[in-house]
Amino acid sequence: MTLLIDAHQHYWQPSRGDYGWMPKDDPVLSRPYLPQDLQPSLEAAGISKTILVQAAATIEETEYMLGIADATPSVGAVVGWIDFENRAHLKHLERLKNHPKFAGVRPMIQDIEDVDWMLRQDVQWAFAALSDLDLAFDALGFSRHLANFLTMFKRFPKLRAVIDHCMKPQIRNHNGTRSELAFWSHGMARLAGETGAYCKLSGLVTEANEDWSAEDLAPYAGQVLSAFGPSRVMWGSDWPVCRLRGEYEEWLVAAQTLCAGLSQADRAEVFGGTAARFYRVS
């Protein structure tokens, strides 16, 4: 039987002090989120494993997450962080690889001002190392990064890459600007067709209006499923960030609605099988 897997969630403790992006007064985000907070939702949904993803640009947070993973059976894998601009961090990558739940890394590219950062010569070693060590790369960005991710995934064809949050299409703006939707759709189709990258069906609600519905998300989910195919798409909650627009269960039900037209076998891929293969969770 295929495991049900949440391919993208976070645990954090703001008092640790390294979540530079986090608004200090946000009533939803600026509070601790720990395994005991998510466990009831996982049990209610029948989800056996999750992929715990970094939320701070520090090695210390990666170590913190691995400690949580050691004590939390539901955490199937951890996506951490290294400094791509510091070649000395190769030793961290090689050391972290020895942890049985360490799966790969995610640089916080969406927060980097230079859209061409990933093309810089001084960060190429990190992409090469991930490829050589057979570790996963979570691609976090916006539509403006699509062309550069295409370049990088072609440059490193053995890199095991997954696109986070469908590359964050700005759903709340697309109702009035169809050209933006077309730009995102074209870029995603090229990534799907010209590289072996995977895609997370996650983060869509956060990019939508507060009164979002599954119907609002359908063009985006449909494009991802059509372009990548269910065997390269994995559902993720993006909890607790999803709580900016709705609770865990609301997004899960919406995602199930968006995938209702798939066969049972394809739904099993999106809600577990793909993530299990990509992150090597059993």
What is the role of each PLM region?
Residues 23-71:
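Alpha-helical scaffold segments that flank or form the walls of functional sites
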Residues 39, 66-67, 94, 150-151, ...:
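Active-site phosphate/pyrophosphate- and oxyanion-stabilizing loops and adjacent acidic/basic residues
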